[in-house]
Amino acid sequence: MTISKLVLASGSPRRRELLAQMGYQFEVVVPNVEEKRAAAESPAQYVERLSRDKALAGAALVAAEAVVIGSDTIVVKDQQVLEKPRDFADAKRMLLKLSGSQHQVMTGVSVTCRGITHSVVVTTEVWFKTLSEQEIEAYWQSGEPCDKAGSYGIQGLGGRFVTRIEGSYHAVVGLPLYETDQLLHKF
């Protein structure tokens, strides 16, 4: 099947940039999906469901023949999901938890068209240097952590906190290029 219309169901400018980097022409819709983890869901199940919910909600907003991509990214430390911070205190708590240690970034990607949905979860291991309270305060003041899972962006100022990664850099940013391309080739 040739993709006649591709839609990204995401308000994330980073996901738009990454999909464009892959050479795809696409439209953007921003579906309203509640991001609430069910008690029995593992972090991987949660992020996969969110990506699927976003793809399906996006599909409901566009023509039936459209191929729709939904994606979500979470940060996981000790099986605890760290999402976008509510305020400075929340961001500080998260960054102190990540400081000087290893965590996982999980990005779920789902692609749907005409009732068929394919999904993948990409997990990347990330290591942080030890952060001082002054670094955390200055980083918060930059405004960068406000809309990011785990309160940091690897592609921006937060990248200076990362000492090492194992896995997909692009998945940490918000859209794993290889895996997304593989899913799109199923349509």
From Swiss-Prot:
The active site is at 72 (proton acceptor). It is found in: Cytoplasm. It is an enzyme of class 3 (hydrolase). Its EC number is 3.6.1.9. Signal peptide: none annotated. It catalyses: dTTP + H2O = dTMP + diphosphate + H(+); UTP + H2O = UMP + diphosphate + H(+). GO terms for cellular component: cytoplasm. GO terms for molecular function: dTTP diphosphatase activity; nucleoside triphosphate diphosphatase activity; UTP diphosphatase activity. InterPro entries: ITPase-like_fam, Maf-like. The record marks 14, 73, 155 as: Important for substrate specificity. Transmembrane segments: none annotated. GO terms for biological process: nucleotide metabolic process. Keywords: Cytoplasm, Hydrolase, Nucleotide metabolism. Its cofactor is a divalent metal cation. NCBIfam families: maf. Nucleoside triphosphate pyrophosphatase that hydrolyzes dTTP and UTP. May have a dual role in cell division arrest and in preventing the incorporation of modified nucleotides into cellular nucleic acids. Belongs to the Maf family. YhdE subfamily. This is dTTP/UTP pyrophosphatase. It comes from Vibrio cholerae serotype O1 (strain ATCC 39315 / El Tor Inaba N16961).
